[in-house]
């Protein structure tokens, strides 16, 4: 059998279970004990949406690739971290996927946003074609920063989720910019100023009620992505404790990055090992039914997740957080400030109230959906793609 087309059900026996350790297991802001909560750990992992290489999907751009094997791993990791944001947005962090159990319409709406077809909001087709505007030809490998930029642009079309996506540049998170972005949605004077919305109104096959309802809110749910370089050719060990703390925060969406020959979606850690979902398995493309439902088992990792030493992590990563409310954001800021006081933990980025004077135009990349990455982005992350190699499967 072709190794590239094996499913995880086939390979289940090859994956190690969690080590018997007193060290806590952290999964996207949740703390577990291996001894007493192993089933809960596995259920949490299984409930994350898992996107892998696919084959035999409609040709990208009509005449392009019908599979992303060998080049799409970072794109799939980008889908996974963004799917976690949509799960938190529409289903909640504590939602769980149970095999064989009928899921809600919102669940299928989230999943359909990533299906391999051209009209899905965050499909491989949309990411690859939007990437052309970022200087990436279809089939070219992306780094974590580039996929973050592309997903931000695609999110502007997702009126159902109505997200504010902020990409923090220059290792700096500016609180004032984020508040301005998240509060810019409040355009109605009050509920009476906005038209009534029927619950079954659809936009591109998705319920639109959530997006319209949020126009009555003072805060637009925030997806915060922070591209970082934590060393030159290998991760600086001074950042390791800080990175671990990111997985402990309830706002955590995880990390996209990898090691020199592959990209992974990191969802937690135990001891000195990162826990991740691996996209390097080629599965047949899935076609949704007319009702919007689809066979979904292949989108959930049903075995103990992969692990790797933190020291093996490539230094070019993107860290993600989701703040549903302004209170969530304020709490995140408080945690980041406390983290700067932890002994032996070197801050990975700076949190400031206002834009430093040496910055150029205020938040050009975050307030202008159709702007390009701009020179300063390329200046800092120019080498990110060179540190990864395409897998030959």
Curated annotation (Swiss-Prot):
Catalysed conversion reaction: [protein]-C-terminal L-amino acid-glycyl-phosphatidylethanolamide + H2O = [protein]-C-terminal L-amino acid-glycine + a 1,2-diacyl-sn-glycero-3-phosphoethanolamine; [protein]-C-terminal L-amino acid-glycyl-phosphatidylserine + H2O = [protein]-C-terminal L-amino acid-glycine + a 1,2-diacyl-sn-glycero-3-phospho-L-serine
List of catalytic residues: 73 (nucleophile), 278, 280
Described function: Cysteine protease that plays a key role in autophagy by mediating both proteolytic activation and delipidation of ATG8 family proteins. Required for canonical autophagy (macroautophagy), non-canonical autophagy as well as for mitophagy. The protease activity is required for proteolytic activation of ATG8 family proteins: cleaves the C-terminal amino acid of ATG8 proteins to reveal a C-terminal glycine. Exposure of the glycine at the C-terminus is essential for ATG8 proteins conjugation to phosphatidylethanolamine (PE) and insertion to membranes, which is necessary for autophagy.
InterPro entries linked to this entry: ATG4_LIR, Papain-like_cys_pep_sf, Peptidase_C54, Peptidase_C54_cat
PANTHER family: CYSTEINE PROTEASE ATG4, CYSTEINE PROTEASE ATG4B
Free-text comment about domains: The LIR motif (LC3-interacting region) is required for the interaction with ATG8 family proteins. Required for proteolytic activation and delipidation of ATG8 proteins.
Protein name according to UniProt: Cysteine protease ATG4B
Alphabetical GO biological process terms: aggrephagy; autophagosome assembly; autophagy; microautophagy; mitophagy; otolith mineralization completed early in development; piecemeal microautophagy of the nucleus; protein processing
EC number: 3.4.22.-
The keyword Protein transport is annotated on this UniProt entry: yes
Keyword list, A-Z: Autophagy, Cytoplasm, Cytoplasmic vesicle, Endoplasmic reticulum, Hydrolase, Mitochondrion, Protease, Protein transport, Thiol protease, Transport, Ubl conjugation pathway
Subcellular location: Cytoplasm; Cytoplasm, Cytosol; Cytoplasmic vesicle, Autophagosome; Endoplasmic reticulum
Family: Belongs to the peptidase C54 family.
Ranges spanned by the short sequence motif LIR, renumbered to the chain: 388-391
Enzyme class: hydrolase
GO CC entries: autophagosome; cytoplasm; cytoplasmic vesicle; cytosol; endoplasmic reticulum; mitochondrion
A GO term for molecular function: cysteine-type endopeptidase activity
């Amino acid at each position: 059998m072709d190794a590239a087309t094996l499913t995880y059900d086939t390979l289940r026996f090859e994956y190690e279970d969690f080590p018997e350790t007193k060290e806590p297991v952290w999964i996207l802001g949740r703390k577990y004990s291996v001894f007493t909560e192993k089933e809960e750990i596995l259920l949490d992992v299984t409930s994350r949406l898992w996107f892998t290489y696919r084959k035999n999907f409609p040709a990208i751009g009509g005449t392009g690739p019908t599979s992303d094997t060998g080049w799409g791993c970072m794109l799939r990791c980008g889908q996974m971290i963004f799917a976690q944001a949509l799960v938190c947005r529409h289903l909640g962090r504590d939602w769980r996927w149970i095999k064989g159990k009928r899921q809600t319409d919102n669940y299928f709406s989230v999943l359909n946003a990533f299906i391999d077809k051209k009209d899905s909001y965050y499909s491989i087709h949309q990411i690859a074609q939007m990437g052309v505007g970022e200087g990436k030809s279809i089939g070219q490998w992306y780094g974590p920063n580039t996929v973050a930029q592309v997903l931000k642009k695609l999110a502007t079309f997702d009126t159902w989720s109505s997200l504010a996506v902020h990409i923090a540049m220059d290792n700096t998170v500016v609180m004032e910019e984020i508040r301005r972005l998240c509060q810019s949605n409040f355009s109605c004077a009050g509920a009476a100023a906005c038209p009534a919305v029927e619950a079954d109104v659809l936009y591109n096959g998705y319920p639109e009620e959530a997006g319209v309802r949020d126009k009555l809110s003072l805060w637009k749910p925030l997806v915060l992505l922070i591209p970082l370089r934590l060393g030159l050719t290998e991760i600086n060990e001074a950042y390791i404790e800080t990175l671990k703390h990111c997985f402990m925060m309830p706002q955590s969406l995880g990390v996209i990055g990898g090691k020199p020959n592959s990209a992974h979606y990191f969802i937690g850690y135990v001891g000195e090992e990162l826990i991740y979902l691996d996209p390097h398995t080629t599965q047949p493309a899935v076609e949704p039914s007319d009702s919007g439902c689809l066979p979904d088992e292949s989108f959930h990792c049903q075995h103990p997740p992969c692990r790797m030493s933190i020291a093996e992590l490539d230094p070019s990563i993107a860290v993600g957080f989701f703040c549903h409310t302004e209170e969530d954001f304020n709490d995140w800021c408080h945690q980041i400030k406390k983290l700067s006081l932890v002994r032996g933990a070197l801050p990975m980025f700076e949190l400031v109230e206002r834009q430093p004077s040496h910055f150029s135009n205020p938040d050009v990349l975050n307030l202008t959906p159709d702007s390009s990455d701009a020179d300063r982005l390329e200046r800092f992350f120019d080498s990110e793609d060179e540190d990864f190699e395409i897998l030959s499967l």
